[in-house]
C-alpha cells in the first residue's frame, strides 16, 4: 500500500520536468520493488529514513516502522522525526535500526563531509540502502540538463539556471567507486535502457523477509565498469 506521492522533481522546472515526471514516477516504483529484493527487509523492521523530507519512504510504505531524519524541520512528517545532521552525529545507539534508508541524498552532502556522514549511517544501521544518481548518466537529474554535472564550475552556474530553480553548488554526483569507498560493496546499478541511472549500495538487513518478493528484476553489481 502506498500513500500520497511527493513531487518527483523538486528542483527542475519547465516543460521537460513535466514530461519527465511520469517516467520518473514509474522508475521510483520499480526502484522501490528493488529495495525489498535487495535488502530483504521485513515489514516489521525498524527503519531510519535519512533525508526524509516531507514524506520520503513513508510515501511508499506508510505502515512501516520508519523514523525520519532531516537537516530541515518537517512539521508535517507523518511519524517519528528527528532534526539532525548525520555528519555531526545522530542521537541513536549503535545498530539501533534494522535498516538505514537514504535515497538521493548523499550527492547533496559536501564531499569533505561524506566520510563522517557515511560512518554515522553505518554506525546506527545493521543494514543499509543508499541510492544516488550516477555521475556517468548523461542527464543531470536535479536540473534535467544534459551533461550539467560534467561542466567546469564557471560554466555550470550559468547553464544550471536554464533547468533548475535551486543552486548547483550543493550538488556533486558520485561515481561508483566513490560510493564503494564510503559504504563498501556490493554496489548495484539501476538502469535506464543500457545506461546506469543510479548507484545503490546495499548491506542486507538482519531483519529479513522469509522469502524475497517475486517478479523483481534486480540488476547486478557488475553491470557497469565505471569507477
For the regions a language model picked out, list residue spans one by one.
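C-terminal lobe and adjacent flexible extensions of AdoMet/dcAdoMet transferase-like proteins
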Residues: 195-227
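Conserved S-adenosyl-L-methionine
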Residues: 185-195
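Conserved class I S-adenosyl-L-methionine
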Residues: 127-154
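Conserved SAM-binding loop
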Residues: 36-137, 203
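Short alpha-helix
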Residues: 165-185
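Class I SAM-dependent methyltransferase Rossmann-like catalytic core
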Residues: 1-40
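Short glycine/proline- and acidic residue-enriched helix-loop micro-motifs
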Residues: 17-21, 159-169
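A conditional alpha-helix N-cap/helix-loop micro-motif detector
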Residues: 28-29, 110-111, 172
